[in-house]
Amino acid sequence: MKDGFLKAAALSPSLRVADCNYNASQIVSQLQDAAARGVRLAVFPEFCLTGYTCGDLFLQRTLQQGALDALQTVLDASRELDVVALVGLPLLVRGKLYNCAAVLCGGRLLGLVPKTYLPNYGEFYEKRQFTPGSTEVENVTVCGQEVPFGTSLLFRCRQMPSFVLGVEICEDLWSALPPSTFHTLAGATVIANLSASDETVGKAEYRRALVSNQSARLLCGYLYASAGHGESTQDMVFAGHDLIAENGALLAETSPFEGGWAETELDCQRMESERARNTSFEPSAEGYLTVDFDLALIETKLSRWVDPTPFIPHDERRRAERCELILKMQADGLAKRLEHAHAKTAVIGISGGLDSCLALLVAVRAMKQLGRPTSDVLAVTMPCFGTTHRTRSNAEILCDELAVSFTEIDIANTVHSHFKDIGQDESVLDVTFENGQARVRTLELMDTANRTGGLVVGTGDLSELALGWATYNGDHMSMYGVNAGVPKTLVRHLVQYEADIAVSAELRRVLLDILDTPVSPELLPAKDGEISQKTEDLVGPYELHDFYLYYVLRFGFGPSKIFRLAKAAFAGRAEYPDEVLYKWLRNFYWRFFAQQFKRSCLPDGPKVGSVTLSPRGDWRMPSDAAAALWLAELEQIPLKG
């Protein structure tokens, strides 16, 4: 449960209709197994103590008492278990029968939540036996314990306050205004649904969509435990279709009729983070009673998949769709700016590297969108001390294949003159040696844009902005930055996508060679004609930095949790032992804080995803903020050896 992780399970034991003792034994057996596996929240189906299909037997006092006796059996068994469990039963309160969920933990009955919406259509006749629950909470005595009864109940873990449980039952979710909506606005981060949803053609897909969409709307975790084998098949069949979703993502599911045990870890902190940044999510806890309970705070072993490349869809079709959409967004943003500025040209510094390649591809799309010739894109290559034949050749071929205007400005003489002006010793390959070239290139581009009535298109990407891997007022500056919202790992896939759809074999070949070229600013002299300065050797692997960037910006997680997630995501990768993950995480935080001043004056550029660093939009951070707290937390992370 540390770091907000909650191991949860939706369970569908095999039952016998109206055999409460047998059902209790099945539930206890599964509950004990779940607890042994580290499950801290176990949700069983609607009426699991009796069976859902008892019909008018629910009105029999013998069955009602049998359900209470079965509840006592489960309560007794739970005394030695560190788990919150929810079971369903009929309950007589003030002469009326209710369809209830009992919430229990450590032998204590925490509360009873009645069903709000009773279906009375098609195959369902619940109003024949039951009364809808009320939002008013009252105390009732059940199994010798005085407990709250009502729909406006929440259950909160003292040791992990981000785990707040709300409960609804089957049809409640299928209604126009589910109780879970109010539960989450009152503070619930996890919703448990005890269900007995019979199986019909197409219903599984609809059920899956309901659960996923509700968890997305409510920014919550959602467990759906449905009745399965053992229910009466007189007129219906039940498939034990169990689902667990989190913020719209389906994390675990059992196939209908394939057994009933869905298990995963929910991230309660993630849900809190989503709500904290969403101003449309307005809390309202009026009329709710919160019951506190205790669970031991231990580290939960992660079994849920942690995506090592959170910006990249893994399904090929979805990835292609995502790439096409992003390219259209980038092109549309640039097209609007070119149109508004009455720009005659789009001027791009082309190096033969990934970022400038993507910017050029976007500019070509923008011109086509505007109905203008691609020759209105002016690509400028500016070779200097570190330029290699490979990148220079690729730049020329790319421009020729895209039919854009091309010019070369050798900046070596200008840089020599500039170094002479400022007294820079050219044998000293320091930051001045590197940044001087970058600033001269920007000067050439800006003045070329002035001369041609054009607009300088920036090439820097989101990952470089996060790390500050750009020369202030050099490649950091442009008139419109089309890649500012695109992380480096995604840049590669966008260029790969353009290669995949390229009609020309030569265009495809050069794009693939650009993809195969090491990422480099080429500011230090080449060695034997090869790139001598490789970015990832200096700042670290971009796939790690993009992973860190995602969790820092998207959810505001701290270093220790991000390190834990990274270990899970990159497990089995020999090149990423814990020491390497730690080294580059520390480097990320140090650079991220130190380089904010560059992000405080960024050119305009389109937002394309949920993570971006525009100082006018998603990221407002003072340039002189201290990183001490984050670095101190890093120091507390234990490393083996």
Ranges and model annotations:
Residues 1-347, 365-374, 401, 406:
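Enzyme catalytic cores with a strong preference for nitrogen-chemistry domains
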Residues 23, 161-163, 220, 232, ...:
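ATP/NTP-dependent adenylation/nucleotidyl-transfer catalytic domains that generate, transfer
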